[in-house]
């Protein structure tokens, strides 16, 4: 697989782990914080499964980039957990691979993006970032938590064009099977999940549930409890 450079096309991408519509686990089978439990329906993807899948994604990414230096953009705040775990595995695989190297594999950058209030897209994208002009002529991998409608990544990739980046690829932990999806595909995907609003593993509902270890479904009571007062 060559280094991807057609954002949204998902050319030559490996298949994600498919989570069926009726898959999931009883909350009582896992350690769930008491202050969250009543607001959740079920565990969709357990923490251990998420971690192992991220390790495999790191392995796939390393195979594609080999020893080419690339820069990783973390889209905060939802991608924080995925990003941190991915970097840990990428570093270990690179540092202890059979091929000796005298340089680090990647640089890391952080971009704050926001496009949701409650469980709905606001239709606008707020971007706060460091100076990204250093990315000119570089390979860039965008790390996103979830592709829902795909609108966020379309707008963000458009925003990046002014920096004259050499290649742009996308890694996301989850892609949601929703009729609202615009067809934007990632190059590295962890899981394909049903059309439900998910929280946990840094995914939030109005900044709540980020510290939940597992990927879970939030129920209507939870949405009502933590609903923002205005869009």
From Swiss-Prot:
Which positions are annotated as binding Mg(2+)? 204
- UniProt xrefs under Gene3D superfamilies: 3.40.50.2020
Record: active site? 148
The UniProt entry's GO biological process terms, in alphabetical order, are: GMP salvage; guanine salvage; hypoxanthine metabolic process; IMP salvage; purine ribonucleoside salvage; XMP salvage
Is RNA-binding a UniProt keyword of this protein? no
Look up the domain of life of the source: Eukaryota
Q: Which InterPro entries match?
A: HGPRT, Hxn_phspho_trans, PRibTrfase_dom, PRTase-like
**Family annotation (SUPFAM superfamilies):** PRTase-like
Give the matching PROSITE patterns.
PUR_PYR_PR_TRANSFER
EC assignment: the record states 2.4.2.22, 2.4.2.8
Q: How does it assemble?
A: Homotetramer.
Q: What is this protein called?
A: Hypoxanthine-guanine-xanthine phosphoribosyltransferase
**Taxonomic classification, please?**
Eukaryota, Sar, Alveolata, Apicomplexa, Aconoidasida
The record's gene field reads: LACZ
